[in-house]
Amino acid sequence: MSKTTVFFSFIILLNFFSLLIFEKHDNLNLTKVIIRPGMNLEEISRELSSKKIVKNSDIFKIWVKLSFQEKKLKYGEFLFEKSNSIYDVTKKLTDGDVVFRKLTIVEGSYKYELLNNLKEIDPNSSLEYDDVSDLIVADTYNYQITDSAKKILHDIRKISNDFSQKIWSEREQTIPLKSI
């Protein structure tokens, strides 16, 4: 075989592979996919293939490995649009472009209500009434579907504490208060 034949064969193979990676795959509608912590590339590719996000799970796996993206894949809930290429899917998974859910704490609500909301999100949670802080700021908080109730409560506590500290540090210093 001549060098020219090998070269053109390589170019054709490269074009074919590029077509598989960058060609848009049409899906009927928006599709949600949940990638759980600890899922490996095989499980992720199977999930994407079963939801018809990628046409061929093997090509997806090959692309992820060849582009050294396997360790960069994030977990969470992803929303895929109607038309995706394997490249687009990989980019979304490595960028961590996840869907955030919202938990709203209304002013004047009880700790018990927050605890019930957290138990609805994570039924396996071992949180109890005393775990919920008395200092929670009424607000809307974001969380991911893969977050545990304990992590969500920790984030709410941190945001509430940071907000309270900010308000305290910006208060009128002449007001005779010693602490929050």
Language model: regions and residue ranges:
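Conserved catalytic or metal-liganding residues and their short signature motifs at active sites
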Residues: 1-180
